[in-house]
Swiss-Prot record:
The gene is ZFWD2. A zinc finger (C3H1-type) spans 30-56, 109-136. WD repeats lie at residues 149-190, 228-265, 272-311, 313-349, 354-396, 404-442. This is Zinc finger CCCH domain-containing protein 63. It holds the Pfam family zf_CCCH_4.
Length: 443
């Protein structure tokens, strides 16, 4: 408990001098009837001191307080005694220990916020700092390394299957290539426009940019520019043999891959959203799209027709994923919603998980023990990890850890061998790994 430097002793004095239930008159206010706070802490250097350098005598039985009121209770309420239900764990209640918050061996309760001075390398409090000196909270995962190079927000991360190269895209208009063995940047490609998203599909690396999609075949070095989008391309996904792009003008463009010519050819344009399409996901022979217009649209991959529009979110729909037979969506309205099909095939909300902040991105993974975990990035610069023991009748989000960042985490990517990646608004990419044994967080 924090001790009130200005009013704490006064409250103790008032209780000792007469409070609720007292039949004797209140003693006159006099500094000589107050115990010196600095003397109690063992460091008073005033001579003479206007306050007492001894403890006040306690009231006799039945005097000064109501029934059942004891000196022990007075001491506990003033913040100077042993254990009480209001004290944090690890409080040393030994009478010989230092009192108040100055000294003693009391355990420091950590605030769930990274110390800014530690980030800058000049925190002098060490283990006694009330803020965290690490980038995560949790024992089942650990930070492996950090990849520095981007100067602005990381908007996409891709790890092609079977490749030893990691690709990251950023609003600094560059695509960086990283060697997975050494963690070193082996190439930087300046694209001349902000990168909105990055996708790996087979041998193809696809990058969303203003007014186009860039496509590279990393096996043959062939490249292609797919024109047609109006404004920034925010999201890319592949369904059956079609590539879909969500664009700033609210349309979804589709290209079909022609194996004979090794090229993507325009196929269709899906319209219906009134604002930018910021997220796409394919599952159960459906294309799901989330938009700044606060809606989710469900499209049939058979005929590319919209078969349902979901309107339960009250702000921008930021991310969509499918998990088993469920659709999960998140929004800047501070919620994660779980949708399930009802009779007739339409989706409805079966559970809403509320956060204190807007939710930016979702990613479903399995930990080292193959347990399902939901990664949930929020706009308070954190990534929350939730156990998902069931998405059936009894849905529950159980938090198992947090990852902290200097700015918002906007990109998440899963890798092989229990590895996953996060990219934040400063341009930092961090590499994490699930642990088979509990491991303390690394700085």
């Amino acid at each position: 408990m924090d001790f009130d430097l200005n009013g704490g002793n006064k409250r103790v004095f008032n209780r000792l001098g007469g409070g609720g239930g007292s039949t004797r008159p209140m003693a006159p206010t006099d500094t000589r009837q107050k115990v010196c706070f600095h003397w109690r802490a063992g460091r008073c250097n005033r001579s003479p001191c206007p306050y007492l350098h001894r403890e006040l005598p306690g009231p006799g039985p039945g005097q000064g307080q109501g029934p059942g009121y004891t000196n022990k209770r007075v001491a506990e309420e003033s913040g100077f005694a042993g254990p009480s239900h209001r004290r944090g764990p690890g409080f040393n209640g030994n009478s010989s220990s230092s009192w108040g918050r100055f000294g003693g061996n009391r355990t420091v309760t950590k605030t769930e916020k990274v110390c800014n001075f530690w980030v800058d390398g000049n925190c002098t409090y060490g283990d006694k700092c009330r803020y965290l000196h690490c980038w995560s909270k949790g024992e089942s995962f650990a930070l492996l390394t950090q990849l520095d190079g981007h100067e602005k927000l990381v908007s996409g991360i891709a790890l092609p299957s079977g490749s030893d190269k990691l690709y990251t895209g950023s609003k600094d208009e560059t695509l960086r290539v990283w060697d997975c063995a050494s963690g070193q940047c082996t190439g930087v490609l300046k694209l001349g426009g902000e990168i909105g998203c990055v996708l790996s599909e087979g041998p193809w690396l696809l990058v969303g940019m203003p007014n186009l999609v860039k496509a590279w075949n990393i096996e043959t070095n062939a490249d292609q520019s797919l024109s047609g989008p109006v404004g920034q391309v925010y999201s890319l996904v592949v369904g059956t043999d079609l590539l879909f792009a969500g664009t700033q003008d609210g349309s979804i463009l589709a290209w079909r891959y022609n194996a004979a010519t090794n090229c993507f050819e325009p196929s269709a344009s899906l319209t219906g959203h009134t604002l930018a399409v910021v997220t796409l996901y394919v599952g159960a022979n459906r294309l799901y799209s989330g938009s700044m217009d606060k809606t989710i649209k469900v499209w049939s991959l058979d005929n590319l027709q919209c078969i349902q529009t979901l309107t339960d979110h009250s702000s921008v729909v930021m991310s969509l994923i499918c998990w088993d037979q469920f659709l999960l969506s998140c929004s800047l309205d501070n919620t994660v919603k779980i949708w399930a099909a009802i009779e007739g095939g339409n989706l409805e909300v079966t559970y809403t998980h509320k956060e204190e902040h807007g939710v930016l991105a979702l990613c479903g993974v399995h930990d080292a023990e193959a347990k399902p975990v939901l990664l949930c990035a929020c706009n308070d610069n954190t990534l929350r990890l939730y156990d998902l023991p069931s998405l059936g009748l009894f849905i529950r989000f159980t938090e198992r850890g947090k990852i902290f960042a200097k700015q918002e985490i906007r990109a998440i990517q899963i890798g092989p061998g229990g590895i996953f990646f996060t990219g934040d608004g400063t341009g930092q990419v961090k590499v994490w790994k699930w642990c088979t044994e509990p491991t303390a967080a690394l700085p």
